[in-house]
Amino acid sequence: MKKLIELKGVSRTYGNGDQTRTVLKNVDLTIVAGEMVAIIGASGSGKSTLMNIMGCLDVPNRGDYYIDGQNAACLSPDELARVRREHIGFIFQRYHLIPDLSALGNVEIPAIYANSERDSRRQRATALLGRLGLEGREHHKPCELSGGQQQRVSIARALINGGKIILADEPTGALDSQSGQEVLAILNELNRRGHTVVMVTHDMKVARHAKRIIELCDGEIIADSGGCVSATETLPKTNRIRQSYWKTLLDRTRESMQMALKAMKTHRLRTTLTMIGIVFGIASVVTVVALGEGARQETLEEIKSLGTNVVSIYPGQDLFDDSIESIRTLVPADANALAKQGFIDSVSPEVSASDNIRFLGKSAIASINGVGREHFRVKGIELLQGTTFRDDRNALQEVIIDENTRKAIFDNTGLQALGQIVFLGSVPARVVGIAKSNNRSDASNRITVWMPYSTVMYRIVGKPVLTGISVRLKDNVDNEAAISAISQLLTRRHGIKDFQLYNFEQIRKSIEHTSMTFSILILMVACISLMIGSIGVMNIMLISVTERTHEIGVRMAVGARRSDIMQQFIIEAVLVCLIGGALGIALSYITGALFNALADGIFAAIYSWQAAVAAFFCSTLIGIIFGYLPARKAARMDPVISLASE
């Protein structure tokens, strides 16, 4: 007969240095296919250690162990898992069922790790439970079954992948006499059908059910009744319908997610408290980004209304130059020279004054701006009615008023403003256009009018000098290069740099930089909150691994690879973080809606789908990173120690 199990000089020692204990000493043993063997011995004789080695849960320190012709010492942990999964079925004294799974779910576990097709394994598991007298009990949890029924579930689990070798550790130890006899009858029947059965027991009555009895004492075989194949049938090959890699991965992922949800449901409060850290962390990050974007957009809109490609030129070397009033070198000829430059779109000379505007007995203080014809293009001011000046050099008595002026002077008169003659101080002027008022809050009630710069210079101010020049640059012109060229041109004309240049693009960049710095600081605080929540996830996952050590041992015993265990716990961590991330994004949007409702138009929180996707990706990454250490710890557990932790 074929040698199925063969041990040659196997020894197993535990401990290091002087603190060592030898449990097995030079054990030689051969078991052929179809035998039913009982290994008997007192407590501490080494029989459980021998069974663990035969079941590829443990490895010897010395000697060789061959299972179905393969040297177990040469196999990797994943290859040992494959041997357990495909050749060995365990029946434990304490059943070792996973409490959160039904009887059917417990039986299916080895088949899941063997890549069996879902419907096929479910039919096979149902048939096994029915054959063992558990029909109608498939969906009961272990706590709803008697001890004998739980042991039958354990037997069905051992057979789901074929169970060429059945290793039974004290199979009747936790059962009453009747249930024990039923289990022994099942084992005898399995052996008759071709399964190789190895029982470990301390009870000679149980051992006598086997055809071969091996006695252990202090780690050595002291008696062996001799081999005898008792099987009367050849074990049929199990037909398993295997799935493709991707379908298998999907199946395992689904099973891991179900286990994760059950674990989260079992510890609702702990899961909720863990998730809160992720919820507030993600919510704070997304909200800070949205508020920062809203503030930035509002600031840019304000600056845009001033014209970011507009350069303003004023007399004096700086704002605190005491000689500004005496400088008379900024003249209309400078504006003409600038207008000839290829990088300039339009130019407007400027003269400022203030005086009363009067019409039919109505009077108001007006800000009078002497400007060129292209001023409205330079500043981007919209003309609602009428046209600009016919000419800006010949002191024409024309005026353009804004909406505030029209309301203050012409409302309730029943007259159209266009074409009417108004007085600016003592200078009469015809209204030729109406411009849109500045919508900034600081100018909402200001009355502003525009006249040709020559008119203001000669008829109102009486000085042939400008108070400023506004220049609009062409699109796609480098602002810094243009400002440098303007400065060089005016310096050559004046012989000295007696002017100052302002460009709102520089102001915009400065404000954007400041805003970005402030946003980054707040974002860092939000990220610290998220990091604290992430550490909480890792902490809870480590606790979960400790609490579920026994479950990990059971899964390893029935054939789970290290990667299977790692995947399960990483998925659980990712699931916690994903749910927390989704709730955090929802909380952020609710917070943004409340802010927009209560901010009274200061600025609005602006959300983007990119930020939401990034937050969702971030929560997934957190689950993977902070779930890795607990998952790695779970995957590296010793199955023997894990099984003993119940």
Curated annotation (Swiss-Prot):
The chain crosses the membrane at residues 272-292, 518-538, 570-590, 611-631. ATP binds at residues 41-48. GO terms for biological process: response to antibiotic. It is found in: Cell inner membrane. GO terms for molecular function: ATP binding; ATP hydrolysis activity; transmembrane transporter activity. It is a multi-pass membrane protein. One of its GO terms (cellular component) is plasma membrane. Signal peptide: none annotated. Keywords: Antibiotic resistance, ATP-binding, Cell inner membrane, Cell membrane, Membrane, Nucleotide-binding, Plasmid, Translocase, Transmembrane, Transmembrane helix, Transport. Residues 5-243 form the ABC transporter domain. Its EC number is 7.6.2.-. PROSITE patterns: ABC_TRANSPORTER_1, ABC_TRANSPORTER_2, MACB. Coiled coil: none annotated. Homodimer. Part of the tripartite efflux system MacAB-TolC, which is composed of an inner membrane transporter, MacB, a periplasmic membrane fusion protein, MacA, and an outer membrane component, TolC. The complex forms a large protein conduit and can translocate molecules across both the inner and outer membranes. Interacts with MacA. Part of the tripartite efflux system MacAB-TolC. MacB is a non-canonical ABC transporter that contains transmembrane domains (TMD), which form a pore in the inner membrane, and an ATP-binding domain (NBD), which is responsible for energy generation. Confers resistance against macrolides. Belongs to the ABC transporter superfamily. Macrolide exporter (TC 3.A.1.122) family. This is Macrolide export ATP-binding/permease protein MacB 2. It comes from Escherichia coli O1:K1 / APEC. The gene is macB2.
